[in-house]
C-alpha cells in the first residue's frame, strides 16, 4: 500500500484592537506542535520504568482514556495471539492511530477476533523510548478515519552518548509465571551524526488456566460426545446395551475414561488445557542515525508464541443438523441419531498453535531550513508478517473415515461412539491445521512545508 501525504497549512493574522493571547493547535503533523497542552497526555520513559511494565502496550492498564486494549494472551478468540493493540475511548482497535516519531506504521495483516486491522504495538522497544504522546480526542481532520478515537505517538531516542543496560524480572506471587527482560542501548557521535543502537529481549513463561481456581472449571462445552436418538430403539449387547426412547440424550458410556465430564451428557472441559499467559520470546532491534538535515531509523521486532495450546479439535457443528444413520461412524443403533461432539475430544492430547510475528519500520527524513521556508520530506516503509498455525482436522478425511473410507488404505472407519477403537494411524490421518502467512505493509511519502510571507504563515 502506498500513500502520499501533502500537508499545506495556511493561517491569516488579522490585526484588531482585540488582543489574542495564544492559539494552540494539537493533533497536527507540525514538528513544533505544543503537545504539552490538553488534550495531549505525555508519558515519559521514566514513567514507564516507574510503573514497571514488561511491554509497551501494558501501559493501557494505567491510562484512564484507554478501554478495550488487547495486550494479553487471548486463547479463546481470533488468531492474533502475540500481538498488542492500544485502544482509546472504548472504540474498536482500528479507531486508534499509532505513530512512530509522527510517522505511520502499517496495520497488521492479521485481524483481531472482531475482524479489525490495527497497528501492533509490540514493535516498540522500551529501551529506545523517549516518551509516548497521547492525543485523547479524535483527529480525523488530519489523519482520517484511523484516528476517530485519538492518536498515540511513540517518540524514540535520537541522541544518546554512552551505554545503558536494563535488567528486568517480574513474577507472579501466587503462581509460577515470570517475565525476564534484558535491554541494551548504545550511542555516540559518528562523523557529524548521532548514532544510537538498541537491543531488547524478553522471555515469558506460561501460566496454565488450571493453576487458577475457578477458571478452567467453568470452561465446559456440551459438545463432548453425546447423542440424541431419533426414534425408539433397543440394543441387545455391547457398550450401548439398553432400551431408549425417541428424543433421549445418550452420553458416551466411557465419558470419564475418555477425558470428558459426565453431567447429563458427556461434556468437554476445554479450559483445562489453555494458557492464561503463553510461552513467548520477544526480540527487538533499534538503530537511528541523525543530524540537522538527515534522520534515518530502523526498528525490527520478532515475537514468537512458542506453545499456545488449543483443543485437540473443534466441535463438529455441521452435525448438529445432520443425522448419523445406522452403521455410520460405528453406530450401534438401529435408528438415526444426532451427534453432539467433536472428532478429537478429551482422550486426545492438546495441540499447540505457535505464532511467529515479525515487523519492521524504516524511515528516512530530510530536513532543511531556508530563509523563509522550513521543509521536511520523508519516506517510510513498514511491514507486519504473521506466520500462523492453528490445528484442527481435515474435514474431507474425517467424513471419508466416518463412512469407512479413511486412512491411506481407504478402508478404515472412524468410530464416534467408541473413540478407543480409532487407531493411531487413522487419528494422524485426519489431523490437519490452518497454516498461513499474513502480511500487511505500508509505504508513505510525507512532504511538510512551513513558510511565512508578510501576514500569512
Could you tell me what each predicted segment is?
Residues 16-49, 93:
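Short, acidic, small-residue-rich periplasmic hinge/interaction motif at the N-terminus
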Residues 32, 61-104:
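Extracytoplasmic beta-strand/coil segments of soluble accessory domains associated
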Residues 38-61, 86-91, 117-122, 169-173, ...:
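Short, polar/charged loop or turn motifs at beta-strand boundaries
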Residues 56-59, 63, 84-87, 101, ...:
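N-terminal periplasmic accessory domains that precede
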Residues 59, 97, 133-135, 151-157, ...:
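Predominantly transmembrane beta-strands of Gram-negative outer membrane beta-barrel pores used
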Residues 84, 150, 180-184, 283-287, ...:
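Hydrophobic, lipid-facing positions within transmembrane beta-strands of outer-membrane proteins
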Residues 103-136:
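Short acidic/polar hinge/loop motifs at secondary-structure boundaries
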Residues 113, 218, 249-278, 295-446, ...:
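Surface-exposed, low-complexity loop segments enriched in small/polar and acidic residues
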Amino acid at each position: 500500500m502506498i500513500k502520499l501525504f501533502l500537508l499545506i497549512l495556511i493561517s491569516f493574522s488579522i490585526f484588531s484592537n482585540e488582543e489574542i493571547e495564544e492559539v494552540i493547535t494539537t493533533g497536527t503533523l507540525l514538528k513544533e506542535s505544543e503537545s504539552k497542552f490538553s488534550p495531549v497526555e505525555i508519558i515519559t520513559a521514566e514513567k514507564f520504568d516507574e510503573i514497571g511494565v514488561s511491554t509497551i502496550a501494558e501501559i493501557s492498564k494505567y491510562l484512564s482514556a484507554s478501554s478495550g486494549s488487547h495486550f494479553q494472551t487471548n486463547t479463546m478468540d481470533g488468531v492474533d495471539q502475540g500481538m498488542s493493540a492500544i485502544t482509546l475511548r472504548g472504540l474498536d482497535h482500528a479507531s486508534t492511530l499509532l505513530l512512530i516519531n509522527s510517522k505511520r506504521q502499517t496495520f497488521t495483516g492479521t485481524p483481531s477476533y472482531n475482524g479489525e486491522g490495527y497497528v501492533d504495538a509490540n514493535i516498540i522497544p522500551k529501551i529506545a523510548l523517549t516518551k509516548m504522546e497521547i492525543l485523547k480526542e479524535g483527529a480525523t481532520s488530519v489523519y482520517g478515519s484511523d484516528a476517530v478515537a485519538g492518536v498515540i505517538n511513540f517518540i524514540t531516542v535520537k541522541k544518546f552518548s554512552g551505554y545503558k543496560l536494563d535488567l528486568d524480572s517480574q513474577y507472579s506471587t501466587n503462581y509460577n509465571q515470570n517475565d525476564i527482560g534484558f535491554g541494551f542501548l548504545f550511542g555516540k557521535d559518528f562523523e557529524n551524526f548521532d548514532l544510537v543502537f538498541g537491543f531488547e529481549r524478553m522471555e515469558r513463561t506460561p501460566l496454565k488456566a488450571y493453576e487458577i481456581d475457578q477458571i478452567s472449571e467453568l470452561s465446559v462445552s456440551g459438545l463432548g460426545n453425546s447423542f440424541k436418538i431419533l426414534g425408539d430403539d433397543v440394543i441387545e449387547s455391547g457398550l450401548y446395551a439398553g432400551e431408549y426412547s425417541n428424543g433421549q440424550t445418550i452420553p458416551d458410556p466411557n465419558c470419564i475414561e475418555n477425558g470428558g465430564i459426565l453431567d447429563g451428557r458427556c461434556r468437554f472441559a476445554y479450559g483445562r488445557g489453555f494458557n492464561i499467559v503463553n510461552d513467548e520470546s520477544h526480540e527487538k532491534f533499534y538503530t537511528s542515525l541523525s543530524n540537522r538535515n538527515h534522520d534515518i531509523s530502523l526498528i525490527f521486532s520478532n515475537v514468537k508464541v512458542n506453545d499456545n495450546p488449543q483443543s485437540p479439535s473443534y466441535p463438529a457443528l455441521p452435525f448438529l443438523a445432520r443425522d448419523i444413520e445406522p452403521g455410520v461412524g460405528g453406530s450401534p443403533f438401529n435408528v438415526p441419531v444426532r451427534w453432539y461432539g467433536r472428532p478429537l475430544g478429551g482422550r486426545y492430547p492438546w495441540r499447540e498453535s505457535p505464532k511467529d510475528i515479525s515487523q519492521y519500520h524504516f524511515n528516512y527524513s530530510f530536513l532543511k531550513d531556508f530563509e523563509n521556508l522550513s521543509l521536511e520530506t520523508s519516506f517510510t516503509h513498514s511491514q507486519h508478517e504473521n506466520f500462523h498455525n492453528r490445528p484442527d482436522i481435515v474435514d474431507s478425511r474425517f467424513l471419508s473415515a466416518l463412512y469407512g473410507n479413511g486412512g491411506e488404505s481407504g478402508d478404515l472407519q472412524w468410530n464416534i461412539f467408541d473413540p478407543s477403537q480409532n487407531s493411531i494411524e487413522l487419528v494422524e490421518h485426519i489431523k490437519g491445521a490452518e497454516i498461513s502467512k499474513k502480511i500487511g505493509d505500508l509505504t508513505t511519502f510525507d512532504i511538510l512545508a512551513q513558510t511565512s510571507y508578510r501576514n500569512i504563515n
